[in-house]
Amino acid sequence: MTNIRKTHPLLKIINSSFVDLPAPSSLSSWWNFGSLLGVCLGVQILTGLFLAMHYTSDTTTAFNSVTHICRDVNYGWLLRYIHANGASMFFICLYMHVGRGLYYGSYMYSETWNIGILLLFAVMATAFMGYVLPWGQMSFWGATVITNLLSAIPYIGTDLVQWIWGGFSVDKATLTRFFAFHFLFPFIVTALVMVHLLFLHETGSNNPTGIPSDPDMIPFHPYYTIKDILGFMIMLTALSTLVLFSPDLLGDPDNYIPANPLSTPPHIKPEWYFLFAYAILRSIPNKLGGVLALIMSILILAIVPIIHMSKQRSMMFRPISQCLFWLLVAVLLTLTWIGGQPVEHPYIIIGQMASILYFLIILILMPITSLMENYLLKW
């Protein structure tokens, strides 16, 4: 008799995705981050749902409702801090996942890669809107500064900003719509994740060597299920440690001051996971130029498959490209640091140099190095 998991209309979809899925035998721990992102998304939706039961999206009560959650709701403090730090975990896994894709040439699966870029934008938008909800000083001023960037769009900019605000400044209408969208977006993200997986399973997974692994496949279960569970345990341990011992480590103390439109914080900055893009934005003196550079800092990922010049897919056997990749990582860490610093000497020039280097490595140095390595292969 055929197993029910192979015949049942619903179970066979799950079976072909997570049980009998043929997977390359050589996948390293860098392939764990996809499933970790799934767990992060689940944790965020679950904690967010319970937080939404107690949160009020009104400018007069939003800050107090968050305080009420932390003080009066049973384990409300735990929900709030898991949700806030879970977002940080989400982005750590996201950046590792994208980095893995860049290093091992996973971007050659263009549909999967492009859906992934869409997912990245959607998650970033969700996180930004979520940061506005506690209605602290950094929430309010962060929302004001970032939404105001749209006014740089020629002709329609100012109208667009006022349309998003629902008035002439960030106010009650803005907070209400941000809450509505923050609630909606994770479900759109979940739908996109399914499309992402659909396209991935059309081609099968890439592997560290970048060589087709059709002759050497193993079933996903039990080999990679057990490997993923180990990943879950490590990540959830790290998240629990962060939440229970230093929940405010990655947050901004200014967000414990209720939003006040009459007093600007000394340094307006977003959450740490947006600092690299914020540094690129600030490094260009022109407003529209800064906005374009900000968008391009993420959208540049879509160009990567087009400028792939190497005869090899993965960087596993390309030492010069590896050096460039890790230089890119160092540049991103530098940008993250600069994004959190005040706009003064020497931070301005460091930020500008790092921004130039970021685009230079991806657009020019990587393709040239690939061509050089192709030439060296003939020796």
UniProtKB/Swiss-Prot annotation:
Instruction: Give the record's cofactor note, including how many are bound.
Output: Binds 2 heme b groups non-covalently.
Compartments in which it is found:
Mitochondrion inner membrane
InterPro entries to which the protein is assigned, alphabetical? Cyt_b/b6_C, Cyt_b/b6_C_sf, Cyt_b/b6_N, Cytb/b6-like_sf, Cytochrome_b, Cytochrome_b_C_euk/bac, Cytochrome_b_N_euk/bac, Di-haem_cyt_TM
Q: Which GO terms describe its cellular component?
A: mitochondrial inner membrane; respiratory chain complex III
Q: How does it sit in the membrane?
A: Multi-pass membrane protein
Q: Which CDD domains match?
A: cytochrome_b_C, Cytochrome_b_N
A Pfam match is: Cytochrome_B
Q: Name one GO biological process term.
A: mitochondrial electron transport, ubiquinol to cytochrome c
Has keyword Transport?
yes
Task: Recite the other comments.
Answer: Heme 1 (or BL or b562) is low-potential and absorbs at about 562 nm, and heme 2 (or BH or b566) is high-potential and absorbs at about 566 nm.
The text of the family note is: Belongs to the cytochrome b family.
* Matching PANTHER family: CYTOCHROME B
This chain belongs to the protein called Cytochrome b
